[in-house]
């Protein structure tokens, strides 16, 4: 007679056997699911900075208006500007979700007073387009920080990890492309284990879920 443990292990083995080929096939088609281009987002960010200088509100408005006017992205952009706190990896800041789907997210993240933390090790490439202020990053073995001023891009490659810091006020257009759902665990961990700020967690869940489901209904994975 089989034990509960052996039965569970068989279930896991069958599940992996079924899911692994599906994940592999989806991975091969990943590029076809994207509607945003990281190079275009960088160009758009630098244009907004050139026009609006240190006026972060105007920079963000410029970027969102341009994305709403672009035929390729207009229907995938959130309808309203909703800000929530985000605690992840020990860092804290404000977050405005412009787009969220299974394979991409585009947000404004930042703070007016500075923050520092762990980037997380993610299942997506993450592009931080710095809009105002600076972002610093550090990897073990180096003796100098990586410094990313306004107008630059900090590319955190999929599966890599760094310490990062926004030493003072800093805001970034953050674009992730890859598998987004596994990243949500990192986004919720601090709230569930440290801050216990359940109203913020609920608001984040509502906005993220609404955007992801809405885009799925449009056929956007």
UniProtKB/Swiss-Prot annotation:
Keywords: Endoplasmic reticulum, Isomerase, Lipid biosynthesis, Lipid metabolism, Membrane, Steroid biosynthesis, Steroid metabolism, Sterol biosynthesis, Sterol metabolism, Transmembrane, Transmembrane helix
Cystine crosslinks: none
CC annotations in GO: endoplasmic reticulum membrane
Localization per Swiss-Prot or TrEMBL: Endoplasmic reticulum membrane
Main location: endoplasmic reticulum
Enzyme Commission numbers on file: 5.-.-.-
A biological process from GO: ergosterol biosynthetic process
One Pfam family from the record: ERG2_Sigma1R
Pathway annotation from the record: Steroid metabolism; ergosterol biosynthesis; ergosterol from zymosterol: step 2/5
Gene Ontology molecular-function annotations: isomerase activity
Chain segments annotated as transmembrane: 5-25
Enzyme class: isomerase
Domain of life per record: Eukaryota
Bilayer topology annotation: Single-pass membrane protein
Similarity annotation: Belongs to the ERG2 family.
Protein name: C-8 sterol isomerase
Source species of the chain: Pyricularia oryzae (strain 70-15 / ATCC MYA-4617 / FGSC 8958)
Phylogenetic classification of the source organism: Eukaryota, Fungi, Dikarya, Ascomycota, Pezizomycotina
